[in-house]
Swiss-Prot record:
It is found in: Cytoplasm. The lineage of its organism: Bacteria, Bacillati, Cyanobacteriota, Cyanophyceae, Synechococcales. It holds the Pfam family Anticodon_2. GO terms for cellular component: cytosol. PANTHER family: GLUTAMATE--TRNA LIGASE, GLUTAMATE--TRNA LIGASE, MITOCHONDRIAL-RELATED. It comes from Synechococcus sp. (strain WH7803). Keywords: Aminoacyl-tRNA synthetase, ATP-binding, Cytoplasm, Ligase, Nucleotide-binding, Protein biosynthesis. This is Glutamate--tRNA ligase. Monomer. One of its GO terms (biological process) is glutamyl-tRNA aminoacylation.
Amino acid sequence: MVRVRLAPSPTGTLHIGTARTAVFNWLFARNQNGSFLLRIEDTDKERSKPEFTQNILEGLQWLGLDWDGDPVIQSEQTERHRSAIQTLLEKGLAYRCYASEEELDAMRTQQKAANQAPRYDNRHRDLTPEQEAAFQAEGRDAVIRFRIDEHREIRWNDLVRGPMLWRGADLGGDMVVARRAPADQIGDPLYNLVVVIDDAAMAISHVIRGEDHIANTAKQLLLYEALSLPVPTFAHAPLILNPEGRKLSKRDGVTSINDFRAMGYTPEALANYMTLLGWSVPEGMNEIFTLEAAAKVFDFDRVNKAGAKFDWDKLNWLNAQVLHSWEPANLLNALAPLWADQGWTLPDTTGWSLSLVELLGPSLTLLNDGVDQAKPFFMEPALEDDALKQLDQEGAKACLQALLSTLEEAPWSGESIDQAQEMLKSAAATAGVKKGILMKSLRAALLGRLQGPDLLTTWSLLAQIGQDLPRLRRCL
């Protein structure tokens, strides 16, 4: 049975790279009728925070990525990790290294001066008992290192990249599997070791993660072998790149799912877009889809090896398509809390509110656009420069005065658009101006600007809440 996992570290909010990895894991698990599991890798005691764990869980739920079972907490598995390290020590596959940080820094400085890649030189790999005793007598603490055969070839078949080959000589020397601690203790177990132990304990069948973990995979395969554990299948997805082709990072600005959510992106559009970051839709499939639809056809044959450049225009287009597909009631449910945050109160009639979202919906790209565009319907807007220039045009105020006089004699409820058309025609004729001048001037008076949604519907909505006449009067 397919069992995959997402293993985020709660040292920050949910990052889009982690979220895209979650999407690929979820899609594969659902495609294979398997399980999508969560493991919280909280072994970084200083940086891991419960609020980040909560943020990650809430972000996954918001995106529609449900998981199976309860999340595994890595820090609760520490004794299992230490037991594995003890096994490696007893087999002679790991050893204590007493080299101080100062000695290691000096080693790296010498390597840099000689234009050599930084690596541990395995200096304490074969200490005699007397040498170990001498270091312990000095009071030195020790890390625990796993022996890496530099002549070893490490091979695996990657579901994305095909046959892979790494050499032991390229892994930087014997790797540290436990932090520095007194010689009679095992320090805190480190990433490559704990991941192997936890994946085996969770019976993970496939490890799906970013290509920046490829070197870790080579190291972890050696640990699987040393501990006689079943080896999962690996798939390394392409990295998400910024528009310049570099790995997307916090320096690029928006990278947290929190940020995308706050900007007004929908979970449907964001999940859709993240799926397209490195995966190609099958021929004949629309690139606007639900996660459930993608899961039916997802496989690694269509996952690209090359990095996926983040395209804001594409994401914005997808988000607009999602918003435009929503029923007015659903859009109102999404916009009403944003309007409430502004202190705006909706009229008692649901019909007016639905008419407003029907008017604004086709022009929305982000949900937050619905705040800016709705503002003139809740607050009297300031007159922008282009609106002031329009109102200074010859005949503009005369036609508005004619329209105001008509409305004061026979108030319009905002219900009959045909009646509004007749009033506009009459006012333009009375003022002796073209209807187009009146239309532009009316928009300037009602909205404070010359761009906006359908004018007659706008006027109708403002008339229904008694806001059309005050706005005409202030311009005269």
